Amino acid sequence: TTATDFCLRHNQLMADTVAVAPDRLVGLAALPMQELPAACEELERAVGTLGLKGAMIGTDIPQGFACQSLDPFYQKLTDLDVPLFIHASSTDGVSGLKDDRLNLHNFSLSLGYAQEETLAVAQLLLGGVLDRHPALDICISHGGGTAAFLAEKIDQLAQVDPTASEGVKQNGFGHELQKLWFDTHVKGEVAATALRHYAHA
């Protein structure tokens, strides 16, 4: 398919670029998440043959990150012992996540990205992904959106949610945040302090 062909070319180019300065660069694989068997196959090739160090995908996963259809993908990441980096997808309609309210004032970047990242964190933790795959390493872009700021509210509601994961119910959402990784590309000390309060970043 087009997606698979693109990822094959992207990953080869990524490996070629890393090879120019392997002591300074590492590369992450792009994966055709529209077709999970192909994504798993390309992940194995990218890591085992091309020497890439993990994978990077967007938040535009229609079934959500907690869907058990993704479990073979998570297991493949664990088997290969490589991390997954999740970056916010655009909310301007390019990836199908169109929200016209975000068209003004760069809201797609300031609010849309944060919304996508927060949803990803919440789905992963409340949906029990790390209960099912405790050795899985996932890093979320931009400090995980607003997850650290909203941790107590999410935890409060999780305690009365019969579908919330056992990990969150037993340990609390804030504690479970420590099972994820976050980059520190956040703006300002207030955001950085909230992130440091809960998570290793």
Question: What is the meaning of each model-derived region?
Answer:
Residues T1-Q123, G127-G128:
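Active-site gating/metal-coordination segments in enzymes
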Residues L102-L126, R132, D137, S141-A201:
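H/E-rich (His + Asp/Glu) clusters that bind or coordinate divalent metals
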